[in-house]
Amino acid sequence: MGESIAQQRGPFARRLQEYAASIELTLSEQQVNQLLDYLELFEKWNKAYNLSAIRDAEGMFTKHLLDSLSIAPHLTGERFIDVGTGGGLPGIPMAICFPQRHFTLLDSAGKKVRFLFQVKQALGLSNVDTQNRRVETFQPQPQFDGVISRAFASITYMLTWCNHLIHDDGRFWAMKGVMPNSELSELPKKYIVKASHALHVPNLEGERCLIELALAQESNSKA
Protein backbone atom coordinates (compact mmCIF):
# COMPACT_ATOMS: atom_id res chain seq x y z
CA MET A 1 0.00 0.00 0.00
CA GLY A 2 1.35 3.43 -0.95
CA GLU A 3 1.85 6.42 1.28
CA SER A 4 -1.15 8.40 2.49
CA ILE A 5 -1.92 12.06 1.84
CA ALA A 6 -0.75 12.87 5.38
CA GLN A 7 2.61 11.20 4.77
CA GLN A 8 3.15 13.31 1.64
CA ARG A 9 1.87 16.68 2.87
CA GLY A 10 5.25 18.39 2.61
CA PRO A 11 5.93 17.49 -1.04
CA PHE A 12 2.28 18.02 -1.96
CA ALA A 13 2.29 21.50 -0.37
CA ARG A 14 5.33 22.49 -2.41
CA ARG A 15 3.82 21.13 -5.61
CA LEU A 16 0.58 22.97 -4.91
CA GLN A 17 2.39 26.29 -4.58
CA GLU A 18 4.42 25.62 -7.73
CA TYR A 19 1.33 24.75 -9.75
CA ALA A 20 -0.62 27.72 -8.39
CA ALA A 21 2.21 30.05 -9.39
CA SER A 22 2.25 28.55 -12.90
CA ILE A 23 -1.41 29.50 -13.42
CA GLU A 24 -1.04 32.86 -11.62
CA LEU A 25 -3.15 31.75 -8.66
CA THR A 26 -2.07 33.08 -5.28
CA LEU A 27 -2.50 30.67 -2.36
CA SER A 28 -1.79 31.49 1.26
CA GLU A 29 -0.31 28.92 3.62
CA GLN A 30 -3.76 28.56 5.17
CA GLN A 31 -5.34 27.83 1.79
CA VAL A 32 -2.69 25.22 0.97
CA ASN A 33 -3.38 23.57 4.32
CA GLN A 34 -7.14 23.66 3.70
CA LEU A 35 -6.71 22.04 0.28
CA LEU A 36 -4.61 19.25 1.76
CA ASP A 37 -6.98 18.87 4.74
CA TYR A 38 -9.79 18.42 2.21
CA LEU A 39 -7.79 15.80 0.35
CA GLU A 40 -7.12 13.94 3.61
CA LEU A 41 -10.85 13.95 4.39
CA PHE A 42 -11.57 12.77 0.85
CA GLU A 43 -9.09 9.92 1.27
CA LYS A 44 -10.60 8.90 4.62
CA TRP A 45 -14.26 9.02 3.56
CA ASN A 46 -13.57 7.43 0.19
CA LYS A 47 -12.91 4.11 1.89
CA ALA A 48 -16.46 3.90 3.19
CA TYR A 49 -18.43 6.21 0.88
CA ASN A 50 -16.86 5.29 -2.47
CA LEU A 51 -16.49 8.91 -3.56
CA SER A 52 -14.03 8.00 -6.32
CA ALA A 53 -12.44 4.97 -7.97
CA ILE A 54 -9.07 6.69 -7.52
CA ARG A 55 -7.56 5.42 -4.26
CA ASP A 56 -3.87 6.30 -4.31
CA ALA A 57 -2.59 9.58 -2.88
CA GLU A 58 -0.75 10.68 -6.03
CA GLY A 59 -3.81 10.00 -8.17
CA MET A 60 -6.09 11.98 -5.87
CA PHE A 61 -3.63 14.86 -5.72
CA THR A 62 -3.13 15.09 -9.49
CA LYS A 63 -6.40 13.85 -11.00
CA HIS A 64 -8.69 15.49 -8.47
CA LEU A 65 -7.00 18.42 -6.76
CA LEU A 66 -4.69 19.84 -9.44
CA ASP A 67 -7.26 19.12 -12.14
CA SER A 68 -9.84 21.13 -10.19
CA LEU A 69 -7.45 24.02 -9.62
CA SER A 70 -6.70 24.21 -13.36
CA ILE A 71 -9.96 26.07 -14.05
CA ALA A 72 -9.31 28.81 -11.47
CA PRO A 73 -7.94 31.45 -13.90
CA HIS A 74 -10.99 31.21 -16.14
CA LEU A 75 -13.97 31.63 -13.81
CA THR A 76 -15.77 34.97 -13.77
CA GLY A 77 -18.64 35.89 -11.49
CA GLU A 78 -19.47 35.72 -7.79
CA ARG A 79 -22.05 32.95 -7.36
CA PHE A 80 -21.57 29.46 -8.77
CA ILE A 81 -23.20 26.05 -8.66
CA ASP A 82 -21.20 22.85 -9.09
CA VAL A 83 -23.70 20.36 -10.51
CA GLY A 84 -23.15 16.65 -9.91
CA THR A 85 -20.33 17.64 -7.59
CA GLY A 86 -19.79 14.14 -6.16
CA GLY A 87 -17.05 14.48 -3.59
CA GLY A 88 -16.85 18.25 -4.13
CA LEU A 89 -14.82 18.50 -7.30
CA PRO A 90 -14.13 21.16 -8.40
CA GLY A 91 -16.41 23.08 -6.02
CA ILE A 92 -14.55 22.63 -2.73
CA PRO A 93 -11.11 23.54 -4.13
CA MET A 94 -12.63 26.59 -5.84
CA ALA A 95 -14.35 27.68 -2.61
CA ILE A 96 -11.02 27.44 -0.78
CA CYS A 97 -9.21 29.43 -3.48
CA PHE A 98 -11.90 32.12 -3.70
CA PRO A 99 -13.34 32.75 -0.22
CA GLN A 100 -15.05 35.92 -1.45
CA ARG A 101 -17.15 33.95 -3.96
CA HIS A 102 -20.06 31.65 -3.12
CA PHE A 103 -20.34 28.03 -4.26
CA THR A 104 -23.40 25.79 -4.09
CA LEU A 105 -22.57 22.08 -4.36
CA LEU A 106 -25.41 19.95 -5.69
CA ASP A 107 -25.63 16.16 -5.86
CA SER A 108 -28.48 13.67 -5.72
CA ALA A 109 -26.46 11.12 -3.69
CA GLY A 110 -27.13 11.67 0.01
CA LYS A 111 -23.91 10.08 1.24
CA LYS A 112 -21.81 12.40 -0.92
CA VAL A 113 -23.66 15.48 0.32
CA ARG A 114 -23.16 14.29 3.92
CA PHE A 115 -19.45 14.16 3.22
CA LEU A 116 -19.53 17.67 1.74
CA PHE A 117 -21.31 18.99 4.84
CA GLN A 118 -18.58 17.48 7.01
CA VAL A 119 -15.93 19.17 4.85
CA LYS A 120 -17.74 22.52 5.09
CA GLN A 121 -17.84 22.23 8.88
CA ALA A 122 -14.29 20.91 9.32
CA LEU A 123 -12.70 23.56 7.11
CA GLY A 124 -14.96 26.43 8.13
CA LEU A 125 -16.11 27.17 4.59
CA SER A 126 -18.79 29.82 5.11
CA ASN A 127 -19.00 30.39 1.34
CA VAL A 128 -20.25 26.85 0.63
CA ASP A 129 -23.86 25.64 0.51
CA THR A 130 -24.77 21.98 -0.05
CA GLN A 131 -27.90 20.73 -1.82
CA ASN A 132 -29.02 17.09 -1.81
CA ARG A 133 -31.45 17.02 -4.71
CA ARG A 134 -31.79 16.43 -8.41
CA VAL A 135 -30.84 19.40 -10.56
CA GLU A 136 -34.24 19.66 -12.26
CA THR A 137 -36.00 20.17 -8.90
CA PHE A 138 -33.70 22.93 -7.66
CA GLN A 139 -35.08 26.44 -8.18
CA PRO A 140 -32.47 28.93 -6.92
CA GLN A 141 -33.33 32.51 -6.01
CA PRO A 142 -31.47 34.45 -7.16
CA GLN A 143 -30.05 32.57 -10.10
CA PHE A 144 -26.32 31.89 -10.41
CA ASP A 145 -23.58 33.62 -12.38
CA GLY A 146 -22.20 30.28 -13.47
CA VAL A 147 -22.74 26.54 -13.65
CA ILE A 148 -19.66 24.34 -13.35
CA SER A 149 -19.69 20.66 -14.20
CA ARG A 150 -17.12 17.91 -14.35
CA ALA A 151 -19.69 15.15 -14.47
CA PHE A 152 -22.33 15.58 -17.19
CA ALA A 153 -22.24 13.02 -19.98
CA SER A 154 -22.68 15.65 -22.68
CA ILE A 155 -22.68 19.42 -22.98
CA THR A 156 -26.20 19.38 -24.45
CA TYR A 157 -27.49 17.54 -21.38
CA MET A 158 -25.73 20.06 -19.17
CA LEU A 159 -27.40 22.98 -20.94
CA THR A 160 -30.80 21.27 -20.97
CA TRP A 161 -30.83 20.27 -17.30
CA CYS A 162 -29.12 23.40 -15.93
CA ASN A 163 -30.75 26.03 -18.13
CA HIS A 164 -32.92 27.36 -15.29
CA LEU A 165 -30.04 27.77 -12.81
CA ILE A 166 -28.35 30.86 -14.27
CA HIS A 167 -29.44 34.36 -15.26
CA ASP A 168 -29.40 35.43 -18.92
CA ASP A 169 -25.82 36.75 -18.72
CA GLY A 170 -24.52 33.70 -16.90
CA ARG A 171 -21.98 31.15 -18.05
CA PHE A 172 -21.71 27.39 -18.27
CA TRP A 173 -18.27 25.86 -17.70
CA ALA A 174 -17.89 22.25 -18.82
CA MET A 175 -14.70 20.40 -17.87
CA LYS A 176 -13.81 17.88 -20.54
CA GLY A 177 -11.00 15.66 -21.77
CA VAL A 178 -10.23 16.07 -25.46
CA MET A 179 -12.01 18.90 -27.27
CA PRO A 180 -15.61 17.61 -27.66
CA ASN A 181 -16.12 18.73 -31.26
CA SER A 182 -19.01 16.33 -31.93
CA GLU A 183 -20.84 17.57 -28.83
CA LEU A 184 -20.27 21.20 -29.78
CA SER A 185 -21.62 20.60 -33.28
CA GLU A 186 -24.93 19.52 -31.71
CA LEU A 187 -25.40 22.55 -29.45
CA PRO A 188 -28.93 23.98 -29.27
CA LYS A 189 -28.98 27.11 -31.42
CA LYS A 190 -29.69 29.48 -28.55
CA TYR A 191 -26.28 28.74 -26.99
CA ILE A 192 -22.82 29.75 -28.15
CA VAL A 193 -19.28 28.81 -27.22
CA LYS A 194 -17.67 31.89 -25.68
CA ALA A 195 -14.23 30.33 -25.27
CA SER A 196 -12.36 27.06 -25.00
CA HIS A 197 -9.38 26.81 -22.67
CA ALA A 198 -6.67 24.16 -22.80
CA LEU A 199 -5.95 23.00 -19.25
CA HIS A 200 -2.45 21.93 -18.28
CA VAL A 201 -2.09 19.62 -15.30
CA PRO A 202 1.39 18.28 -14.43
CA ASN A 203 1.71 14.48 -14.56
CA LEU A 204 -1.81 14.05 -15.89
CA GLU A 205 -1.93 12.02 -19.09
CA GLY A 206 -4.34 13.00 -21.82
CA GLU A 207 -5.82 16.31 -22.88
CA ARG A 208 -8.03 18.46 -20.65
CA CYS A 209 -10.10 21.48 -21.64
CA LEU A 210 -12.68 23.86 -20.26
CA ILE A 211 -15.55 24.91 -22.52
CA GLU A 212 -17.25 28.21 -21.66
CA LEU A 213 -20.78 28.61 -23.01
CA ALA A 214 -23.46 31.28 -22.82
CA LEU A 215 -26.88 32.19 -24.10
CA ALA A 216 -26.64 33.74 -27.57
CA GLN A 217 -27.08 37.53 -27.52
CA GLU A 218 -30.04 37.43 -29.87
CA SER A 219 -31.92 35.15 -27.47
CA ASN A 220 -33.94 37.38 -25.17
CA SER A 221 -35.09 34.55 -22.96
CA LYS A 222 -34.02 31.04 -21.98
CA ALA A 223 -37.60 29.84 -22.31
Curated annotation (Swiss-Prot):
Enzyme Commission number(s) from the entry: 2.1.1.170
Domain of life: Bacteria
One GO molecular-function entry: rRNA (guanine-N7-)-methyltransferase activity
Localization per record: Cytoplasm
Reaction equations catalysed: guanosine(527) in 16S rRNA + S-adenosyl-L-methionine = N(7)-methylguanosine(527) in 16S rRNA + S-adenosyl-L-homocysteine
Any Pfam family matching the protein: GidB
Keywords, ordered alphabetically: Cytoplasm, Methyltransferase, rRNA processing, S-adenosyl-L-methionine, Transferase
Positions contributing to S-adenosyl-L-methionine binding: G84, L89, V135, E136, R150
Role, per record: Specifically methylates the N7 position of guanine in position 527 of 16S rRNA.
Family under the similarity heading: Belongs to the methyltransferase superfamily. RNA methyltransferase RsmG family.
PANTHER family: S-ADENOSYL-L-METHIONINE-DEPENDENT METHYLTRANSFERASES SUPERFAMILY PROTEIN (PTHR31760:SF0)
UniProt protein name: Ribosomal RNA small subunit methyltransferase G
Organism: Saccharophagus degradans (strain 2-40 / ATCC 43961 / DSM 17024)
Gene coding for it: rsmG
